[in-house]
Curated annotation (Swiss-Prot):
Function field: This protein is involved in the repair of mismatches in DNA. It is possible that it carries out the mismatch recognition step. This protein has a weak ATPase activity.
GO biological process: mismatch repair
Protein known as: DNA mismatch repair protein MutS
Sites where the protein binds ATP: G628, P629, N630, M631, A632, G633, K634, S635
InterPro entries assigned: DNA_mismatch_repair_MutS, DNA_mismatch_repair_MutS-lik_N, DNA_mismatch_repair_MutS/MSH, DNA_mismatch_repair_MutS_C, DNA_mismatch_repair_MutS_clamp, DNA_mismatch_repair_MutS_core, DNA_mismatch_repair_MutS_N, DNA_mismatch_repair_MutS_sf
Gene giving rise to this polypeptide: mutS
Length: 876
């Protein structure tokens, strides 16, 4: 007996069963399912995609299982839609039809052909050609009692692949400087993900724990690099980094990324060679983004990035975040910049050539993974043709670094010549359109094309012959995709059709036929076209394989070109901005004459010339206490010193008349503060955390830039902390320090410590305002001019007047400062009233007066005494 409709099991359609099977394997991905000319999404994915892409959400029948949500888009527009999804943080799995639907028996076979995530993408619609796009992995482990993190990162678009190990406490800072688009973490380390996610707007992907095993990692790395040992890469002893690198390779292989053979090397992050810049320093110095809105505008990078090639732009960004610490390396860059600066013709010619070279790194990655179009390969070949000129110029240079770059350049003449012979520069440049292989490159392809191109003439011959045989002058030989080639005869002439005509289709006003000769030629034409397309594609794949086989040489050449671009960029900046070559040494002196802030001077322009300042800090004046009002230039002075040092150790010339710089191992900054609400930290706690990190990590070779330490708490607490920090820096760290403060009491330190010196930001007072000269000069300031600044800001007059009254009262109070280091300023735990002490004295004086016995003269005398008490002239 048949089951009722209600009791029958609800079954999805065969295609939906296929979809659900694939989706089960990729639950965390938006699954794009190819159906004819569309990519469709179903169920929850459809709802997600509809909202993310702002496309229509509709429904589709799912057999007895009812209707399901559906959203989709045309396959030819897929790149743009996928880019939008990935930019919004989604991971996308592309499931394509892998057999001809016309030949399929049952459901068309489908497979995952590509995976696109924020960390795995080659699309120009997603990538910024001036930024690296890093995929990172983190592996936590212990060595003895020490908790460490192994970190590996790769940019699949440039083949940069490196690793390191570091204490877990330094992990967040390292990752924030790297700014990866995606971070891989073991399922056992989900707490780490939750912790990092609070401060990083990055996609975290959790992988199975087995993918982070040491044994698995070694096997994966050795298989990939085709070696029995990793010692040759210098990473054999970096177990945590190897584990992370192994996880990355496994993730890429599972992500259907095609051949990864172009990832030909892996290296270590050489922490001893470069300076570490923590997040506070990167932010406060506005190295790659401004503090105002996080954009490039107003940053150091915006000012000095005059690179001509995306490879150079990406390297410049990395250089700025990792200044050099080795004197020889810094001097070599300065030598190269100086030679490029002195030779205008060589500098400009090299920059022009660099501008004509394609992004070799990203082109190679797309070619090696079968994602490139013929046009990109052709541009690669034409780029090789420019390299001999650059190589010849650099080989004749005196600077050792420039000659070294010449040695690393390889124009690959044989490959370039093959590309030139193979690809037609006049072709459309897409694989779909064909015609991109030059005529004369391959004999068989030429023959097949001849058959196809001669088809029209042959068809006209058949048409003319049949018109003669049948006496039907309107007879036509035509073609469509459904019926192929056919002969069309009008209904009026159908009685003249010979018996050997085989009917194919009947229309309202015509009949369509075929004949043996037409069938034979149709098969020949279609076979030739099919063979031609297949052969052309095969030849292109062979050409791409030849390019990929030279991956190591191309990457080495690309790295040399990027470095040349950066050095020429520095020379161009030095020429245009009047930068000088700094004298570098191993000492601990910092002496800048006529120093300028590289960003502010560009913003101000010619209408308001930037006020240059000298800065000398070292063995005899190690700690500069800088006082003065807001808006007078103290913070800019601090940042200016930091940026001059950073530029020098990156290899650039610097904005100054002259500069002598003893190498710095770290630059620390504490400028401004804000609440860290996500971590439950107040402004003052954030400030103290940053200050503690500086005191615990700085050395004698560090540069400390400290602004308004202690302002996040009460006056006396803050001043005590600032005072104590100055003592600690002077006595223990002995680091070069610029210390800007509103605590004028700190000026006392100069008389008590041999290497502490006072400076101040000068102002000129007029009758009703103050003028900030933005000049830093010797000596202490005795006024912060805060009320004048408030007045300039437009505070109501009554607020300004009341502030003056309160200030006058507060200035009559004396703050005791320690006479010895062991006796810090006395801390007042409570402040009942602004004039608590004055009120107490006045109360005592008033209570002791016997009004009934006062003569008029006595009353006048008592009034004078009370006035003196109020003005602080008497202690009562």
């Amino acid at each position: 007996m048949a089951k009722s409709a209600q009791g029958r099991k609800k079954e999805p359609t065969p295609m939906m069963r296929q979809y659900l099977e694939v989706k089960e394997r990729y639950p965390e991905y938006v699954l794009l399912f190819r159906v004819g000319d569309f990519y469709e999404t179903f169920l929850d994915d459809a709802v997600t995609v509809s909202a993310a892409l702002n496309i229509v959400l509709t429904k589709r029948s799912n057999g007895s299982a009812g209707e399901i949500p559906l959203a989709g888009f045309p396959h030819h527009a897929s790149e743009g839609y996928i880019a939008k999804l990935v930019t919004k943080g989604f991971k996308v799995a592309v499931c394509d039809q892998v057999e001809d639907p016309a030949l399929a028996k049952g459901i068309v076979k489908r497979e995952i052909t590509d995976i696109v995530t924020p960390g795995i993408t080659y699309s120009d619609k997603i990538l910024d050609d001036r930024h690296n796009n890093y995929l990172c992995a983190v592996a936590l482990f212990k060595r003895g009692r020490e908790h460490l993190a192994g970190v590996a990162f790769v940019d699949v678009t440039t083949a940069e692949f490196r690793m390191t190990e570091l204490p877990v406490a330094e992990l967040k800072d390292f990752l924030q400087s790297l700014h990866p688009s995606e971070i891989l973490i073991s399922s056992r380390d989900k707490e780490l993900r939750d912790s990092l996610a609070k401060s990083m707007n990055t996609l975290f992907t959790v992988l199975d724990e087995w993918m982070f095993s040491a044994e698995q990692a070694s096997q994966v790395l050795e298989n990939h690099f085709k070696t029995h040992s990793l010692k040759g890469f210098g990473i054999d002893g970096v177990e945590g980094g190897r584990i992370a690198a192994g996880a990355i390779l496994q993730y890429l292989e599972e992500a259907k990324q095609g051949s990864l053979k172009y990832l030909v090397r892996i290296g270590l992050v050489e922490s001893a060679e470069t300076m570490t810049l923590d997040i506070q320093t990167r932010r406060n110095l506005e190295i790659i983004s401004s503090m105002q809105d996080g954009s490039l505008n107003g940053s150091l990078l915006e000012v000095i990035d005059r690179t001509k090639n995306p490879m150079g732009a990406r390297l410049l960004r990395r250089w700025l975040l990792h200044p050099l610490r080795k004197l020889e390396a810094v001097v070599q860059r300065h030598d190269a910049v100086e030679e490029l600066l002195e030779s205008d013709s060589m500098r400009e010619e090299s920059r022009q050539l660099l501008g004509g070279i394609i992004d070799l790194e990203r082109a190679l990655a797309r070619i090696a993974t079968s994602r490139a179009m013929p046009r990109e390969v052709r541009l690669l070949g034409s780029s090789f043709a420019l390299i001999p000129q650059l190589k010849a110029m650099l080989a004749s240079c005196e600077a050792q670094r420039l000659r070294h770059l010449a040695d690393r350049l390889d124009s690959l003449p044989e490959l370039a010549e093959t590309i030139e012979r193979a690809l037609d520069p006049e072709a459309s440049g897409t694989l779909r359109d064909g015609g991109y292989i030059r005529a004369g490159y391959h004999e068989e392809l030429d023959e097949l094309r001849a058959i196809s191109s001669g088809a029209r003439d042959r068809l006209l011959e058949i048409q003319q012959a049949e018109r003669s045989k049948t006496s039907i002058s309107t007879l036509k030989v035509q073609y469509n995709k459904v019926f192929g080639y056919y002969i069309e005869v009008s209904r009026a002439n159908s009685d003249k059709v010979p018996e050997y005509y085989e009917k194919k289709q009947t229309l309202v006003n015509a009949e369509r036929y075929t004949i043996p000769a037409l069938k034979e030629y149709e098969e020949k034409i279609l076979t030739a076209e099919e063979k031609s397309q297949f052969l052309e594609h095969r030849l292109f794949q062979e050409l791409c394989a030849a390019v990929a086989a030279e991956a190591a040489s191309i990457q080495k050449t690309a790295a040399a070109l990027a470095e040349l671009d950066c050095l020429a960029c520095f020379a161009s900046c030095a020429d245009e901005y009047r930068y000088c070559r700094p004298a570098m040494n191993e000492g601990t002196e910092l002496s800048i004459t006529g120093g300028r802030h590289p960003v502010l001077e560009r913003i101000l322009g010619a209408d308001e010339p930037y006020v240059a300042n000298d800065c000398r800090v070292g063995s005899d004046q190690q700690l500069l206490i800088i006082t003065g009002p807001n808006m007078a230039g103290k913070s800019s002075y601090l940042r200016q010193a930091g940026l001059v040092v950073l530029l020098a150790q990156v290899g650039s010339f610097v904005p100054a008349e002259s500069a002598e710089i003893g190498l710095v191992d770290r630059i620390f900054t504490r400028v401004g503060a804000s609440d860290n609400l996500t971590s439950g930290e107040s402004t003052f706690l954030v400030e103290m955390n940053e200050a503690a990190s500086i005191l615990n990590n700085a050395t004698e070779r560090s540069l400390l830039l400290l602004d308004e330490i202690g302002r996040g708490t009460s006056t006396f607490d803050g001043m005590s902390i600032a005072w104590s920090m100055c003592e600690f820096i002077h006595d223990r760290l002995r680091a070069r320090t610029l210390f800007a403060t509103h605590y004028h009491e700190l000026a006392e330190l100069e008389s008590r410590f041999e290497r502490i010196v006072n400076f101040n930001a000068t102002v000129v007072e007029t009758a009703d305002t103050v003028i900030f000269l933005r000049k830093i000069v010797r000596g202490a300031s005795d006024n912060s001019y805060g009320i004048e600044v408030a007045k300039m800001a437009g505070m109501p007059p009554e607020v300004i007047e009341r502030a003056r009254e309160i200030l006058a009262g507060m200035e009559r109070r004396e703050v005791e400062v320690p006479t010895q280091r062991e006796a810090p300023p006395r801390v007042v735990s409570q402040q009942i009233s602004l004039f608590e002490e004055e009120e107490s004295r006045l109360r005592k004086a008033l209570s002791g007066i016997d009004i009934n016995r006062l003569t008029p003269l006595d009353a006048m005398m008592e009034l004078k005494r009370l006035q003196d008490i109020a003005l602080g002239k008497s202690k009562a």
